Amino acid sequence: MSFKFDWESLRDESFYERAKTILADALNSDSKPPIIVDDITVKDLDLGDESPFLEILEIGDMADDRFRGIFKLNYTGNASLTLTTKVQANPLNVYRQSFDQSSFVAPQFLAAGSSLAIPLNLTLSDIRLSGIIILVFSRAKGLTLVFRNDPLESIKVSSTFDAIPPLAKFLQVQIENQIRGLFRELLPGIIHRLSQKWVTRDETKSNSNTVMSPHVTQPPSPKLKPVSIMDINPDLPALSPTNMLKISALCASQRTLSLFTPSISDAVYRSNLEQFDVVDEESQFQSEDPYDIVRIQSRNYYRHNHQAPKRRTIKYKRKSKKTDEGDNASTEVTTRETTPLPTSSTPLETSTPSREVIREVKEKLLAEPSSVVMSPSEEKTTLRSIPPPLELSPPSLDLSIDTSLRPYASRNNTPEKKEKPQRPAGPSKRNTLPAPTKKGPGFFSSNLAGYDVPPPAYSG
């Protein structure tokens, strides 16, 4: 379902004059940018020959004095609007006007800062609109129109600066943004004020010809005088004596020259609020939000007054320190004495004893009394009773081949080779050590020459 507008009825001159006045007041009501140095005047307004297309999407409420509905609006007509104003062409003058600091620090432009106003004619045409409208009408409040989306699809902007492409493009973008704001904020207010005039005019005509309708609101009654407690019960005092005593005592407590005045409960002093007038270093603005103040104060507190709390560390598997050095020395001596000599045919690398150890051993030997004294004949007999050293034979090498390492043989298919019994190695001249014929420390070094067996190692 759609509407068919009688567009010719809007060509009344009085309607155009009223629309121009309302549109000019709306354009000049808000604060204009400093580049515009004159009022904006509506020079020409033409709604064109083609009417918009309005489609009903939903009707929510309908009665004699109210209506609510949702519509879809499409417009591709030839309406046009021409505005006239003056702009400031000197950017230095614009900068000086927008500079809100003290004149002492402002740059003092001479001839370069003089004003240069240029007239500007701005024409808007070829308007393309497509949007969804929420329309609410009430006989008492008038007509309210709200756009749910951005209705502007395209518009053509013609101005005095069309010969300069950068300025023309800049004006095109800026005017499109302003028109979107016009449809979103200014146009609903303009239509609402016009509808109120039409509704009141219709009401005056109906009141003069017919009886007042019950739907018309009654004029408001005069304001009633407020009733106070003193009017109800004049015997009661205006102020409670208890409250007066508390107030007087509180006032007297502050009449002192002491630096430490008693504080008032549930009260905040202005001197204590100075610490909250802190400018945030990160955002560079003075905050009044209590959460921001708490955040700033806590950060300053932990930054200047206190260190960050240390983390708790737990150490485990820590060896205890040995404080007694004498116990360490005795432990080392006992371990050295109780360590058995390795029974190996290979020589061992032993460290030579220190001079202190040798000196201690000599002192012990000299301190012990010699209980047994042997004669030279007894010494010879004792040396002869020493058994000869063991026969040393070279280690036998196992030269058998492990068949599991062969790539093409398996343990299941290859028969195992039987090992032949080895003959016990008999005594030979090369492998048998002769009986000791010489006593003294050079026995082993002289009699082992020519043998492959290394001499046994001695540990100090």
From Swiss-Prot:
HAMAP family, per database record: Mdm34
Protein family: Belongs to the MDM34 family.
Stretches for region Disordered: 304-356, 368-460
Locations listed in the record: Mitochondrion outer membrane
PROSITE patterns for this protein: SMP
Main location: mitochondrion
Full protein name: Mitochondrial distribution and morphology protein 34
Native source species: Yarrowia lipolytica (strain CLIB 122 / E 150) (Yeast)
GO cellular component: ERMES complex
